[in-house]
Amino acid sequence: MEPGVAARVAAVADPVLQGMGYRLVRIRISGESGCTVQVMAERPDGTMQIEDCEAVSRALSPVLDIADPIDRAYRLEISSPGIDRPLVRRSDFERHVGHLVKIEMAVAYQNRKRFRGIIKGVEGDGVRITRDDVAKDADPDVVLPMADIGDAKMVLTDELIAESMRRGKAAEREKKRDLGLAPPLAPHAKPAAQAKPKPKAKDGKPAKKPLPTDTKKHRLAADRARRGEIDPD
């Protein structure tokens, strides 16, 4: 596909996504088995459910048909970035500080194009990573110019999976709150018992606890009273 087509699709898709509360991650156009336009999007919190993809597809498809940024038949595909997502913006690197990343440079840096390491932070126009594939006597830290990065992708790790699950659960709770649905009660949980009101005090003195009236002593006294042996009063 000719250069600039992805940019034209992005110019059409980005306003639609922003209006729906999503963020455009990447446009990828493939010519294999026909033309496929892949629109990768996400929520502000980095999540994207199947329902979100369906909503974006319904909204974006007619807009692309009218704008017609591609001069041939194509298949529209809406996808989420996934756990091992690409990093394309400054905010992507900032959000994933502490995680492992693979970077392919479009322009060689220090005579190499491939880097792998932990993201330490963003400094100016570069991203600092601590490489995990250097010799013991070499400095593992390197700052790569973001403008020269051709492709950057997260490496699937247990830590990344755990964070993705946490974000997914948080997004699900937020969705339920937006719909006004309370989270279901856990099977083992019981409703909290309501405290019974305490007897009110009279004349500034604590109220006395009522004495029991159904003890053995009371029953014997009542029996003798019925036989006329004692006065029940």
Curated annotation (Swiss-Prot):
Sequence ranges of Basic and acidic residues compositional bias: 167-179, 220-233
Cell compartments where the protein resides: Cytoplasm
CDD domains (UniProt xref): YlxS_C
Function according to Swiss-Prot or TrEMBL: Required for maturation of 30S ribosomal subunits.
Keyword annotations: Cytoplasm, Ribosome biogenesis
Biological processes, Gene Ontology terms: ribosomal small subunit assembly; translation
Cytoplasm recorded as keyword: yes
Gene name per UniProt: rimP
Native species: Bradyrhizobium sp. (strain ORS 278)
NCBIfam families: PRK00092.2-5 (NF000932), PRK00092.2-6 (NF000933)
Main location: cytoplasm
One family name in Pfam for this protein: RimP_N
Domain of life (superkingdom): Bacteria
InterPro entries assigned to the protein according to its UniProt record, in alphabetical order: Ribosome_maturation_RimP, RimP_C, RimP_C_sf, RimP_N, RimP_N_sf
Gene3D superfamilies for this protein: Ribosome maturation factor RimP, C-terminal domain, RimP-like superfamily, N-terminal
Name recorded for this polypeptide: Ribosome maturation factor RimP
